[in-house]
């Protein structure tokens, strides 16, 4: 093997650049050539491919977003489009592809694997919803951004005796809501993985008022419903001075945390080591702080990410 390709796909996540750097540098230091593919699978099919230079990778480990850009490209679900992508890879002499991204990105790598092309998936998404890994690149940064925003909102809630319903990202997973909610002492954390009772939440906030806590913070995962809708339903069960806030895309950007930079570096280097061993068709990740690799087809077809819902029980035990 002489050449590998790298692409980022789907929603951007802080730490993707650190992964790109690690993959490219590890490949170059092993005597391989690294090729970047701009705009994800769309750029792959269009041949937007270039040879990477080590000197251009010096200042990206600390940057959010992705220097390779990203684009949604649902057309890659079609067999004909997948084969066009493989043609481009062969045209550039690229013998293996490392894909950094989330669920949709992994399915693209899975399809390439099914066509006999060597691909490895690196988990990069703020949602932390990829099977085969405890944590994804970008999750820690997003959770920290959400935590900082919730701390600020809580200051205002305290000052004005208000109840805030704050919607955080996560797609269909409640991990960002759970982790940021626990870290900010939320009165309630509402996630898709568990049933919830809005009336019971309202009663708890009313009870808190009687016991001396005159403000409230509800952290809501976007996979449940929107903040405005939740607030409207909450207000039916109490006389609250409530506000609804959606944090939105602020959770994706910004400098990655130390955890995301190190995780991305470990996973990027691991992808190259596996390729050098002649292995491929894999989804890589981290489990109990150990790097792991699983068959990407089996991982996507037979496994699901498991959100640690016991964290919600923890929050219930330590809240006001």
UniProtKB/Swiss-Prot annotation:
The active site is at 127 (proton acceptor). Its EC number is 2.7.1.11. Mg(2+) binds at residue 103. The keyword Nucleotide-binding applies. PROSITE patterns: PHOSPHOFRUCTOKINASE (PS00433). One of its GO terms (cellular component) is 6-phosphofructokinase complex. One of its GO terms (molecular function) is monosaccharide binding. The keyword tRNA-binding does not apply. It comes from the Bacteria. Substrate binds at residues 125-127, 162, 169-171, 222, 243, 249-252. Belongs to the phosphofructokinase type A (PFKA) family. ATP-dependent PFK group I subfamily. Prokaryotic clade 'B1' sub-subfamily. Homotetramer. This is ATP-dependent 6-phosphofructokinase. It comes from Ligilactobacillus salivarius (strain UCC118) (Lactobacillus salivarius). The lineage of its organism: Bacteria, Bacillati, Bacillota, Bacilli, Lactobacillales.
